[in-house]
Regions:
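Residues that define the transmembrane beta-barrel architecture of outer-membrane proteins
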Residues: 1, 49-53, 104-110, 158-162
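Residues on the lipid-exposed face of transmembrane beta-strands in outer-membrane beta-barrel proteins
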Residues: 2-8, 55-59, 112-116, 126, ...
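Transmembrane beta-strands of outer-membrane beta-barrel pores
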Residues: 8, 22-28, 61, 78-84, ...
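Short loop/turn motifs that connect adjacent beta-strands in outer-membrane beta-barrel proteins
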Residues: 9-18, 62-72, 121, 171-173
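Transmembrane beta-strands of outer-membrane beta-barrel proteins
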Residues: 16-20, 55, 70-76, 112, ...
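Oxyanion-binding "anion nests"
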Residues: 23, 46-92
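Outer-membrane beta-barrel translocator domains and adjoining extracellular loop/strand segments
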Residues: 29-42, 84-103, 135-150
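Outer membrane beta-barrel transmembrane domains
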Residues: 121-174
Length: 174
């Protein structure tokens, strides 16, 4: 696992930081529950290689580097996960029987937000975040051993969510 951050000041009122992180693991029989195409709850397992890349950044502004009265903070992160290994369907043989095949996937997620303190004790902000199920290659589906409907949680999903913030804090300790 690796992580690195750099940053600095821009004038007397602005600071920034950017980072890059890489995490890797090799799970063995990492399980998750799903409901297959027959409506039966099944437990599936993944074994293989998982890699996660994270990019992050923050920009802070405060007049004369004094955030007590007015300040603004812009930050965001991007995540990308890739997996390569084997997928075991229905490890408990609760439905269509246990089957195994290859599995490759890439998913991503991100958020960006800005928070502005316009006077002591008051802040407003906006955040937008999203996930992307990305691309998957499921050997059991590609060979026709299972229908994609048997693994619905691995299907495409790309939610987006906007969030507004209005905050009043009666003290600096919240």
């Amino acid at each position: 696992n690796l992580s690195s951050h750099v940053g600095g000041d821009v004038g007397a009122s602005t600071a920034w930081q950017a980072g890059l992180s890489y995490l890797g693991t090799s799970p063995q029989n990492r399980t998750y529950r799903d409901v297959d195409s027959t409506g039966t709850e099944v437990t599936n397992g993944f074994s293989g290689r998982t890699r996660l890349l994270v990019l992050d950044g923050v920009l802070k502004w405060a007049p004369n580097n004094n955030p007590a009265h007015t300040n603004f903070k812009l930050q965001g992160e991007y995540f990308r996960r890739s997996e390569n290994g084997g997928l075991t369907y229905d490890t408990q043989a609760a439905s269509l029987g246990t089957r195994s095949g290859s599995y490759r996937s890439r998913q991503s997620g991100w958020y960006a937000q800005g928070v502005y303190q316009f006077m002591p004790e008051w802040r407003v902000g906006y955040r937008y975040d999203g996930l992307n199920a990305g691309t998957t290659s499921i050997g059991l589906v590609n060979t026709g051993a299972l229908a994609a409907a048997a693994l619905p949680i691995l299907g495409g999903y790309a939610p987006r969510r906007p969030t507004l913030l209005a905050d009043w804090s009666s003290s600096e300790f919240g």
